[in-house]
């Protein structure tokens, strides 16, 4: 239960508070995760990011830059946001939650269901932290230390990309979320959430340049999901393979229409 609430007005002050209280303190963005089961925090000190001026969207030489405190719904409403990212933002089913949650909080929460991560992985998003460090989102997920996330950068925001979520109902548990993207130089990206302990890319499958049934089978063989109330291992492998192959076909069609 949070007993102390600090509201610094600069990144430097926020970092100093974190250095002072270390593991006793938690970064507080929108609060949708820290105040709700199953991600409710047990930390007693909260460091609010509300006054750090991180709620913005900008362009820099063709790259899309998003402040970590940008709320999901206003971000989804922005007309210039890439279609796949807009689609993924809608996977957070409740408009109320989208108005509270921040994109940085969704990344940092590292929850079991992370419906935004596949599209960010497929778009090769980079993360900027309060100490000036920049990491690819894939590297961050491999070692998600307790850093202060300040910015998300997508250098190629309009690459051909498609994403989809499979769930039992709109508000129900997600079986799998997938995103597929095609790049100009080094082939496809395949990113998944829901079939492993964290979101991941299928690098080995990407290198094979497959499509159709061959792609379905390769994806199914590359993942090792656990059986639970969302489905059996066989079902999860099957539906994930079909989903990725369909998304790849969508990307191919979109690329042809753009020519």
Swiss-Prot record:
Residues 1-159 form the FAD-binding PCMH-type domain. GO terms for molecular function: FAD binding; oxidoreductase activity. Disulfide bonds: none annotated. It comes from the Bacteria. PROSITE patterns: FAD_PCMH. InterPro entries: CO_DH_flav_C, CO_DH_flav_C_dom_sf, Diverse_Substr_Oxidored, FAD-bd_PCMH, FAD-bd_PCMH-like_sf, FAD-bd_PCMH_sub2, Molybdo-cont_Rdtase_FAD-bd_su, Mopterin_DH_FAD-bd. This is Uncharacterized protein YgfM. It comes from Escherichia coli (strain K12).
């Amino acid at each position: 239960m949070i007993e102390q609430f600090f509201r610094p007005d600069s990144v430097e002050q926020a970092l100093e508070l974190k250095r002072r209280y270390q593991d006793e303190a938690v970064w507080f963005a929108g609060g949708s995760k820290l105040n709700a089961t199953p991600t409710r925090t047990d930390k007693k000190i909260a460091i609010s990011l509300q006054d750090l001026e991180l709620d913005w969207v900008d362009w820099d030489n063709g790259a899309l830059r998003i402040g970590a405190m940008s709320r999901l719904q206003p971000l989804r409403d922005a007309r210039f946001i890439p279609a796949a990212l807009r689609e993924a933002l809608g996977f957070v089913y409740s408009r109320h939650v989208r108005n509270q949650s921040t994109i940085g909080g969704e990344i940092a929460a590292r929850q079991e269901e992370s419906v935004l991560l596949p599209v960010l992985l497929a778009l090769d998003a980079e993360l900027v932290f309060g100490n000036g460090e920049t990491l690819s989102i894939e590297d961050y997920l491999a070692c998600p230390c307790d850093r202060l996330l300040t910015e998300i950068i997508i250098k190629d925001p309009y690459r051909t990309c498609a994403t989809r979520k499979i769930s039992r109902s709109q508000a129900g548990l997600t079986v799998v979320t997938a995103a597929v993207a095609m790049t100009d130089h080094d082939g496809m990206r395949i990113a998944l959430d829901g079939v492993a302990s964290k979101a991941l890319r299928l690098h080995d499958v990407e290198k094979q340049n497959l499509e159709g049934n061959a792609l379905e089978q390769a994806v199914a063989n590359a993942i090792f999901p656990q059986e639970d109330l969302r489905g059996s291992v066989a079902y999860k492998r099957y539906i994930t393979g079909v989903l990725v192959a369909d998304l790849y076909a969508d990307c191919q069609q979109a690329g042809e229409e753009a020519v």
